[in-house]
Each structure stands twice: as structure tokens, then as C-alpha cells.
């Protein structure tokens, strides 16, 4: 079923970012652009050369790929004459939020691991690259679209917001969150009395939440101790601002939900059923972001999470700890949460696995698990009905799946009992009784023993 929907989603919305990579000093064959960015240093930097309309077709035209005449374009010649070069594509944006943005030559300063050379079209991009590339030694150049690079000045996706916000600017500063709304949490808050956001065709992401479980992991003498506190929605209020949801138009890209919660009562976390481990006070705030990524193959999953406001007060032996600043986790920290599905489907989950964030105490991590949540990234079933009334699609997957751990325990236990019963039955069937009146000299009971 997933394969069929993956194929269908490719037909509905297939988008990827083209890129041309080149370098004179570093072998780049087969290395994804994202890996090159992760390993970039000031001594071996990565230079993005971007314009909004870049495609491989545009590069082919500039390189005179369809004629026999040599190209006079600086970038085309640089790629052709480089020692290592290749073309790539990737299905979602590459994170380069700390890159040095260069839209003019006088903005350049040496020492950055990542640069972004930006032009509004090919000619301005090429001219600026010609001025700057020679100043950046041992670099890997990546010619691609502006949309392919995640940077504050290259935001490509529209924020889901009010009509007034959309008409002003996609890149306006984050508004202050308005709060005090009762649970359940639904963002964007479409057609709500307290904060009305109008549904728009093409932007159909939704996030629903009824509660949280806060999990504390503490390491002491090479042993991990866990304590948790279930916090129902009745103990929370939530807040929302116009920039709290990032919702691309399509199934491919990064979908971001920012959650702002405030505790309405004191909470006590327990180790087991009787031992107090930590507390959270009334008025404490919990702020975290969830980034779901839709890929080219028709799947989506939680790819990244960050927390900026999360703290506990511990009882001995648990330590008090807090998340200072914005802590970002990804990779193995998010891949086991079971928050994944197929393009066009929503996901319902009674309880997710916790996402753990590092704290100011090296031995303590604080995790957040979603309770009774539903997540939708893109609903292409009924776009007209969506605009009339925002809703979750009926195509919904559950994070538990058909066979849970409890189901398998029951199935295996039943199979073992059935096997024992069958073995006993077969053994009883092999017992033969003799009629002593036919031949009183024979043994009355014969039990066959087979090797």
C-alpha cells in the first residue's frame, strides 16, 4: 500500500533541487552535498553559488552544451576546467543557517566555513562569483537554486498565516505568540474564534495535540535512571504566532511546527509508581519545534527537533536541569519516534517515543513524548473542501501498526501453548492398550518409544 501511494505522490508532486558541484583540490565523487556542508571548515569551505531560477537546463545552455561553440561563461568554464566535477540533486533544503551571505563583493570576509554567493539572475550571480571565487582557497563550489539552501535570507516557503501577513512578506520577523488558549492544541488554528487563520489551497498541514509526557533520563555510575510525568491538556494552555508553522506547497520539503505551552498546575514526575523524581511549577514554559521532512520518494518523517525552553527541578538523586538556548537534535534522536508516514496520509499516535534534548547537566537529558496527536503535512484528496473547512484527511495511519509489542507477546505465548497442547495430544495418541482377555500373558499397556 505504501509503495502505491509513494508512486502516486511522485506523480502528484515531484520536486528536487538540481546542483553542479566542482572543486580543484577535493575529490567529491559520490559525496552528497549535505555531507560536504556538514564537514566544511574555514580551511576547506563550501561555496554555494545561487540564483532563484537555477536548473541543470539553465547550466547546459550557459555551457553551450547544445552547440559546438566554446562557452565564454565564467562559471561554465570553471566547472569544465576543474579537476573534480559532477551534477547532483537532492530532495530537500540543505541547512546553511550560519553561512556568510554575499550579495556584493564588499560583504566578503575570510574565515567562514560556508559562503552563499547570491545573484538575482544568472548574469549577476556569475559576475559576483568571478570576483569572489579566487579569494576562497581549497573550496568546493555548489551551483544551485536559492531555494535549495536553508538560510534566513533565502526562505522559499510561505508561512501559514493570515491574509494580511501573506500579503506583506514571507520573510518578516517572527511575531510574538498570543497565548492562553485551552487544549486541545490545533495549529494552524483555522477558523477559530480566538485566532482565525484562513485555509489556503496548497497549504494543508495540520498539527493536533492533547497532552505531553516529560521523560527525564539521568546517568549515574554508568546506570541510566528514568522518571516521567504525564501532563494532560487540562494542565496546559498554548500560544500561537503567525510564524509558528512552515508549510510548503507540495509533499516535498521541510514542514515545521513550533509549540509554545504553559503549565497551569504544578507537576510531579515519578520514578516507578512511588518515588518522586522531579517537579515542574505552574507558569513554567515548554517551547519546542518539530521539523518533518517530505522526500522525493513519497515518504515523510520527523527529521529534526529543537527545544528552547524546558526545565525541571530534581529530587535526590535526580539533578535539576534545563535546556539552555536552542538545542537541536536529529538523526538517531528522532528516527525512532515512529512519527512517519506516506505523502498524502496523516498520522495518528496515542503516544510517541520521546525525543531527548541535552541539558546544562551533562548526565541529564529531558525528553518530550507526544500524547494523542495527529499530524498532517499535505492533503491532496479534496482541495476544494479543504478551503471551505480545514480538516484531516480520512487516509490516516497509526503509529502503533498492526502488531504491537503486546500483540506479539500474546501471539508467541499462544503459539507456545498450542505447540505444547499438540505435543501432549500426539503423545497420548501413541499410547496403546491391550485387551487382557485376548492374551493374558501379554503386557496390558504398551507405550511406543520413538527415537
UniProtKB/Swiss-Prot annotation:
InterPro entries according to UniProt: Ac45_acc_su (IPR008388), VAS1/VOA1_TM (IPR046756)
Signal sequence region: 1-16
Pfam families, per database record: Ac45-VOA1_TM (PF20520)
Transmembrane segments: 408-428
Chief place of localization: membrane
This protein's encoding gene: vha-19
Protein's name according to its UniProt entry: V-type proton ATPase subunit S1
GO CC list: membrane raft; proton-transporting V-type ATPase complex
Glycosylation sites: 191, 235, 249, 330
Record note on disruption phenotype: RNAi-mediated knockdown at the L1 larval stage causes arrest followed by death at the L3/L4 larval stages. RNAi-mediated knockdown at the L4 larval stage does not affect development into adults. However, only 26% of the progeny hatched into larvae which die at the L3 larval stage. RNAi-mediated knockdown at the L4 larval stage or in the germline causes egg compression in their uterus. Fewer oocytes are produced in the oviduct and are endomitotic. This results in a reduced rate of ovulation over time.
Membrane-side (Cytoplasmic) residue stretches: 429-451
General function of this protein: Accessory subunit of the proton-transporting vacuolar (V)-ATPase protein pump, which is required for luminal acidification of secretory vesicles. In the germline, required for the trafficking of the receptor RME-2 to the oocyte cell membrane where it regulates the uptake of yolk proteins. Also, plays an essential role in osmoregulation in the embryo, probably by regulating the proper formation of the eggshell.
Lumenal side of membrane: 17-407
Keywords: Glycoprotein, Membrane, Signal, Transmembrane, Transmembrane helix
Tissues where this protein is expressed: Expressed in pharynx, hypodermis, intestine, vulval hypodermis and the H-shape excretory cell.
Compartment(s): Membrane
Quaternary structure (record): Accessory component of the multisubunit proton-transporting vacuolar (V)-ATPase protein pump.
UniProt GO molecular function: ATPase activator activity
Membrane topology: Single-pass membrane protein
GO terms, biological process: intracellular water homeostasis; positive regulation of oocyte development; positive regulation of protein targeting to membrane; regulation of cellular pH
Amino acid at each position: 500500500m505504501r509503495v502505491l501511494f509513494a508512486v502516486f505522490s511522485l506523480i502528484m508532486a515531484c520536486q528536487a533541487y538540481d546542483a553542479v558541484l566542482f572543486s580543484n583540490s577535493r575529490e567529491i565523487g559520490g559525496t552528497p552535498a549535505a555531507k560536504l556542508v556538514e564537514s566544511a571548515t574555514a580551511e576547506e569551505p563550501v561555496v554555494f553559488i545561487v540564483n532563484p531560477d537555477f536548473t541543470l537546463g539553465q547550466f547546459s545552455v550557459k555551457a553551450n552544451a547544445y552547440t559546438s561553440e566554446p562557452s565564454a561563461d565564467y562559471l561554465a568554464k570553471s566547472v569544465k576546467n576543474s579537476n573534480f566535477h559532477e551534477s547532483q540533486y537532492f530532495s530537500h533544503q540543505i541547512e546553511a543557517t550560519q553561512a556568510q551571505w554575499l550579495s556584493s563583493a564588499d560583504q566578503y570576509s575570510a574565515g567562514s566555513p560556508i559562503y552563499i554567493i547570491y545573484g538575482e539572475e544568472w548574469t549577476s550571480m556569475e559576475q559576483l562569483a568571478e570576483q569572489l571565487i579566487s579569494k576562497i582557497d581549497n573550496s568546493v563550489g555548489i551551483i544551485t537554486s536559492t531555494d535549495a539552501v536553508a538560510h534566513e535570507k533565502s526562505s522559499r516557503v510561505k508561512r501559514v498565516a493570515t491574509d494580511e501577513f501573506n500579503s506583506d512578506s514571507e520573510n518578516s520577523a517572527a511575531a510574538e505568540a498570543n497565548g492562553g488558549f485551552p487544549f486541545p492544541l490545533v495549529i494552524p488554528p483555522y477558523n477559530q474564534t480566538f485566532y482565525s487563520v484562513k485555509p489556503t489551497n496548497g497549504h494543508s498541514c495540520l498539527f493536533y495535540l492533547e497532552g505531553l509526557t516529560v521523560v527525564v533520563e539521568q546517568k549515574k555510575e554508568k546506570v541510566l535512571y528514568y522518571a516521567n510525568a504525564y501532563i494532560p491538556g487540562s494542565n496546559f494552555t498554548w500560544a500561537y504566532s503567525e510564524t509558528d508553522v512552515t508549510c510548503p506547497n507540495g509533499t516535498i520539503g521541510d514542514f515545521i511546527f513550533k509549540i509554545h505551552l504553559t503549565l497551569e498546575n504544578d507537576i510531579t514526575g515519578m520514578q516507578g509508581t512511588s518515588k518522586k523524581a522531579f517537579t515542574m511549577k505552574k507558569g513554567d514554559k515548554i517551547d519546542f519545534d518539530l521539523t518533518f521532512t517530505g522526500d522525493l520518494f513519497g515518504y515523510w518523517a520527523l527529521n529534526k527537533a529543537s527545544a528552547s525552553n524546558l526545565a525541571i527541578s530534581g529530587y535526590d538523586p535526580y539533578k535539576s536541569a534545563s535546556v539552555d538556548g536552542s538545542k537541536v537534535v536529529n538523526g538517531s534522536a528522532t528516527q525512532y519516534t515512529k512519527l512517519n508516514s506516506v505523502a498524502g496520509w496523516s498520522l495518528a499516535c496515542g503516544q510517541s517515543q520521546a525525543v531527548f534534548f541535552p541539558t546544562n547537566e551533562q548526565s541529564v537529558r529531558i525528553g518530550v513524548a507526544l500524547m494523542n496527536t495527529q499530524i498532517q503535512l499535505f492533503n491532496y484528496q479534496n482541495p476544494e473542501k479543504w478551503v471551505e473547512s480545514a480538516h484531516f484527511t480520512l487516509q490516516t495511519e497509526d503509529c502503533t501498526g498492526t502488531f504491537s509489542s503486546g500483540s506479539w507477546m500474546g501471539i508467541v505465548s499462544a503459539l507456545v501453548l498450542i505447540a505444547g497442547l499438540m505435543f501432549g495430544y500426539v503423545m497420548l495418541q501413541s499410547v496403546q492398550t491391550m485387551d487382557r482377555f485376548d492374551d493374558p500373558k501379554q503386557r496390558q499397556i504398551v507405550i511406543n518409544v520413538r527415537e
